[in-house]
Structures are given as structure tokens and as C-alpha cells.
């Protein structure tokens, strides 16, 4: 999904999203978004550009057709001609539709790494 977004392959992005629509929350602090059915044109118009790299992805199967995913995303994004660094925590729910895994929900929250919480040794212990 993120590879398709980085490559601006919006047809692949759309194919990996639920045809019934997705629910999302952006990392900009705005309110939760209503159900959205994306189009290639929307992605072309609103994608920020740049490259986002995925770190520490985890997938936890909640049921036969629901998987919870969490990861960190970091990279550089471009908006209005200005490039800036991007760090966020991501949680997603993937569901099986017609035998294919697709994104149903996405929640992005800013990761300032030290703004609220200072990393401790215990953060990395099992």
C-alpha cells in the first residue's frame, strides 16, 4: 500500500482500499474523517508527494477476515512546494473482501519522539 503511494500508483492504492469505503484520521490533528471512497483523481489532487518509509510493522490477525496493523512511518513530504520531515504512528484495519485483503480503517497520529514520552530501555523489552 505504502509502496504504491510512494510510486504514485493510485490505481494500485485504490485497489488496496475497501470498495465500500474507508474511515481515516489524519496526523494533522483534525477530526476523524467520514467514510470515504477514494478515486484516482482525488489521490492525484491531494497526495502530498515525497517518500514515506515504513518501520517496525506488526500485523495481528483478529479474526479470519480482519487484521490489525500498526507501524511507524517516516519520510519527507512535499506540500505547496515546501518539503518537510514526516513522522507518524499508523494503525490500520485490513479486511478480506471478495477473498482479497484491503484497507478499511487508517489512523495516523504524529510521532514527535520525545515530546511527550522519553524513550526508555523498558520500551524495547518484551
List PLM regions with ranges.
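A short local loop/turn or secondary-structure capping micro-motif enriched for an aromatic residue
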Residues: 32, 76-79, 111-115
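A mature extracytoplasmic/lumenal domain signature
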Residues: 17, 27-28, 71-75, 90-92, ...
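A short gly/proline-enriched turn/hairpin at secondary-structure junctions
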Residues: 16-32, 42-49
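Short, aromatic-enriched amphipathic alpha-helices that serve as compact interaction elements
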Residues: 1-9
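Surface-exposed, charged secondary-structure patches
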Residues: 37-84
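Beta-strand elements of well-folded, non-transmembrane domains
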Residues: 6, 75-79, 94
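Short beta-strand edge/turn micro-motifs at domain boundaries
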Residues: 87-118
Amino acid at each position: 500500500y505504502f509502496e504504491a503511494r510512494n510510486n504514485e500508483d493510485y490505481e494500485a492504492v485504490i485497489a488496496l482500499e475497501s470498495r465500500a469505503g474507508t474511515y481515516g484520521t489524519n496526523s494533522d490533528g483534525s477530526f476523524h474523517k467520514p467514510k470515504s471512497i477514494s478515486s484516482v483523481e482525488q489521490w492525484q489532487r491531494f497526495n502530498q508527494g515525497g517518500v514515506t518509509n515504513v518501520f517496525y510493522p506488526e500485523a495481528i490477525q483478529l479474526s479470519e477476515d480482519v487484521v490489525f496493523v500498526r507501524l511507524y512511518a517516516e519520510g519527507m513530504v512535499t506540500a505547496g512546494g515546501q518539503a518537510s520531515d514526516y513522522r507518524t504512528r499508523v494503525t490500520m484495519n485490513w479486511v478480506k473482501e471478495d477473498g482479497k485483503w484491503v484497507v478499511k480503517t487508517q489512523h495516523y497520529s504524529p510521532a514527535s519522539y520525545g515530546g511527550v514520552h522519553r524513550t526508555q530501555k523498558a520500551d524495547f523489552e518484551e
